[in-house]
Every structure is written in C-alpha cells, then in structure tokens.
C-alpha cells in the first residue's frame, strides 16, 4: 500500500443549527448533523468524491489519514473540516482531532495579504479553476432547513432525491472547491508560510478546541433576571407614557415631542445627552 503524504479535502454538511450564528462547535453537536459530501485528493491525484448522503462510505485508508499526524491535510478554513470529522468519527465533545497536521489555505492567503474567501483568492490569483458561483444557492438548498410549503410537500429539508440535477451540480461544486484549493497551493508554494506561523495557528486551534468553562446555572439565572427586568421596566414605561409600545422609536419620539423634547434619534449616545439636559 502506498503511504499517503498529503490530503486535500472539502466537505458539504447539514445541521439544523445555524453555523453563522453559533459557530462550528455547536453546529456539529446537533443531533441531525451529518456530512453529505466529501471531496478529496491524495498526493495531488485527481479529485474523488464520496456521496455519503446516498450511502457511499469513506475508504478506511482515508479515514486513517484524517487522524494520522504524519499526513498533512489541506482545506480552506480547515478548522471546519477538522471539527466536523471529529464529530463524524465519534470524538466526544471537548476532544477533537489534533490540529498539528492541518494546513489552512485561508490562513495561507491571509499571510500573503490575499482575500480570505476561496472565490476572492481564486480571482486575485487568476486560477484556471475558479470556485463555482452557484455554490451559495446549492448550500442554502441542501445544507439548511427549508420552509414547508404546499409546493415542496411541507418538507423542512431538501434531500438529494428532491432535486437530483441540483445534487449532481452540488457534487461538481464540492469537487471544484478541492481543485481550487490545490491550485492555490501550487500558486503559493514558492511563498511558504513560516513554521512559527503554523505553530501559532495550531495554538489558536487548540485554544478554540479547549474553550472556556461557563457556569450555566449563573447564565440561565442572568437571562431570567434580564427578562424580569425588561418586563418590569416596560410596565413602568407604559404607565408613564401611556404608549402601547414604548420600545417603538416612532412612538417614543412622538411622546417626547408632545412633552417638549425634540430629537432625531434615540441612540444610546443621544439618550445619554438628553438625560444630562432634562429630568423626566
């Protein structure tokens, strides 16, 4: 068996948790998290794709390479792939695949003063295989919850069987991302990231993996107190102003105007200035 030295990879995933709002760690902890597609290349070979959503399996030798610190893994925003594969491989929360053998092409681009996005880097470097622009629509369609309608049979998620043509384009998109990442590496190979920068990157990853301890009882009580305070203050404001919704900027500005106070805004700074001038 030929020993794998490098692995370029990209995945497409599904989770009911909003990635942009919550980050990758809660994202992979969702019960419905799954890897849909996995495109990869070993040692610069032609990109292959595994359609996990349709039952295909990742070869054991590739799974071993993902965990093997002797195999250098490349991905754009590599922490996403690393954490997703940690969940996929059954690592417990708080324990993740070591970042030591991962190289992030986004970090490489940042070091070179290039755009951080894959499409931005591809455009600046004039790559032959640019990121496919329809990717956002495909990700929105397959990778997140959808609104139930009569037209879609009231489903809350789109599966490959719901639009086979789109699914095939999604697979092409996944493959193209790996091809683009590989071209980025070839373009930047003469400008390597110093080892001390990779050391800092790995340290940053370990810090993120470790997280911080949070007293959740305290957090929950603080949220409860905040809700109680808001309710109490809203009641007091309604009593004083006799407005239906004192939270409404327009209603509050109208009430202030009726009471001799004119203001164009109720931003924090403006309110502080008003309070210093008047007494209500």
Predicted regions and their residues:
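Short secondary-structure capping/turn segments at boundaries of alpha-helices and beta-strands
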Residues: 23-27, 61-62, 267
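Sterically constrained small-residue positions within well-ordered secondary structures
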Residues: 2, 29-31, 96
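A short alpha/beta connector and helix-capping loop motif
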Residues: 19-36
């Amino acid at each position: 068996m030929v020993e794998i030295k490098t692995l370029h990879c990209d995945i497409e995933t599904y989770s009911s948790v909003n990635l942009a709002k919550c980050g990758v760690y809660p994202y992979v902890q969702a019960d419905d998290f799954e890897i849909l597609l996995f495109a990869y290349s070993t040692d610069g070979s032609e990109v292959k794709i595994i359609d996990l959503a349709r039952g295909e399996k990742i070869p054991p030798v590739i799974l071993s390479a993902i965990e093997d610190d002797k195999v250098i893994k490349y991905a754009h925003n590599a922490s996403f792939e690393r954490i997703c594969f940690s969940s996929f491989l059954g690592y417990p929360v708080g324990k993740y695949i070591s970042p030591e053998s991962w190289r992030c092409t986004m970090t490489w681009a940042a070091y070179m003063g290039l755009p951080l996005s894959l499409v931005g880097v591809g455009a600046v470097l004039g790559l032959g295989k640019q990121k496919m622009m329809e990717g956002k629509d495909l990700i929105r369609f397959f990778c997140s919850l959808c609104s139930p309608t009569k037209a879609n049979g009231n489903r809350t998620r789109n599966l490959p069987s719901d639009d086979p043509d789109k699914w095939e384009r999604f697979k092409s998109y996944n493959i193209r991302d790996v091809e683009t990442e590989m071209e980025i590496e070839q373009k930047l190979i003469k400008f390597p990231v110093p080892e001390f920068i990779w050391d800092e990157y790995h340290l940053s990853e370990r810090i993120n993996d470790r997280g911080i301890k949070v007293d959740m009882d305290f957090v929950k009580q603080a949220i409860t107190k905040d809700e109680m305070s808001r309710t109490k203050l809203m009641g007091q404001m309604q009593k004083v102003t006799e407005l239906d919704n004192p939270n409404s900027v327009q209603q509050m500005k109208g009430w202030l105007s009726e009471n001799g106070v004119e203001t164009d805004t109720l931003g924090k700074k403006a309110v502080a200035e008003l309070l210093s001038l008047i007494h209500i």
